[in-house]
């Protein structure tokens, strides 16, 4: 640590970032519950946690149908956030049934960009939990069409 305490501040910031990603991962894992709810609908094979700008965390699971009416876990979590009166996304994590992370699909990225047209580039997405790799939505969606 130098006389300005920069190393300490950086270490504290890193720990805080690790803590929030751990919390998001744990919340997603808690709702991850793959199951069949009918002959043609499976749910819970992917779970997502979205941290709103307020710090509140919203979760959702995927709903896979025999038609196009299903929904991804990330959009389900975002809709949960919006239902609860929030619209500013800070961080997103999506967990597959094996505990590994997934990147949001094109439809989920598109919704994030449309919900936060002026700030979508700042949204952070963890793409590898074990290696702690985080990318911004700008990195994942560099050429948004609007």
Residue ranges, per PLM feature:
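C-terminal binding/interaction regions
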Residues: 2-38, 86-146
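Short beta-strand scaffold segments in enzyme catalytic cores
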Residues: 42-52
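Hydrophobic "anchor" residues
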Residues: 56-57
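Compact, glycine-rich, soluble single-domain proteins
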Residues: 61-75
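Active-site- and interface-proximal helix/loop "cap" or "latch" segments in soluble metabolic
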Residues: 70-72, 80-88
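Short amphipathic alpha-helical face segments that pack within enzyme cores
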Residues: 72, 76, 107-110
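Feature captures the catalytic cores and cofactor-binding loops of soluble hydro-lyases/lyases
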Residues: 76, 80-81, 104
